[in-house]
Structure formats: C-alpha cells, structure tokens
C-alpha cells in the first residue's frame, strides 16, 4: 500500500487556526504554556520534514556501515521556542497567514543526526509547562557539542552518496527566531 503524502499546508492551517483560537489564554497564570506551544510543535512534526541535505558525522558513519544504531531527523530550529515568539507577537504572526506560513515552513527544516546526539540536543531544553529554558541558542548548539556537519548528495543507498564537509553556516535559521531564543537562555 502506498502512503499518501502528508499535506504540510493542512498542518500549517491547523496550527495557525489553533493558535489564533487559543490566543486569549496566553499569559494567564492558570494556563499550562506547554499545552499551547505544543500545538505548533506537534503540527510542525506531524506535517513532515524539509531535509536540508545535512548530516552529522556520527549519523553518516551509522548510515555508511549499516549500523543497528539509529538516526533521526532533528528539527534543529526549536519550534517550541518559536511558538512563544508567535504568541507574544500575535499582531505580526497570527494576523497574516502568509507570515505565519513562512515561520512554519522554516521550522520544518531537519538535519540527519544520530539518536543519541538528538537526545543530547534535547537535554539543552527544559519545559515544565510554565518555564521554558534553553542553555544554548540553536545556531550554536551543534558547535557546543563539537559535531561535524556534512552535506550529502545523491539518492538510494547511503554508500552511493557523496559527502562534503560544511561549516555551521550551512544551517538555515530565521534571525527573528534566534533573537527570540536569547530570552530563554539561562
């Protein structure tokens, strides 16, 4: 059975409408903030991914050796932090679907990483439902952990692909989202 491709625009519309509908709850002491920011994150995650053809060295080694160790796709731009930015600036992000859509599709970008590295990156963020904290801005996280990035090309078997070392500058970030992250750094 062939799977029907996920329609990312549908997930984007759902996130936009859900966030607009729940905006009145934002900032109220009784509101579990995580329940609101997850609306954005879950729709990003469930909408699929836009792989930017980057892979971390350890994941590359796993793929090339057909290792039993697992890899995953890291939504490296921290969509939950972006949800705070959207709720805090509804006049900008929730009044125009086109503006929202750009942020949404920026957040769908992924990099192939080893599962244990993804766990390490995840530990850089804490969220208890009311307090959201990060230790390192997204554009510095991979550097902090000393991972090496490669751009890959080709398709099919990983052993048939070409890998080229690249700098961290090849990662694509939204500047407004990065500035927003600074308020969560502790």
Where are these regions (language model features)?
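Short Cys/His-centered divalent metal-binding micro-motifs
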Residues: 102-133
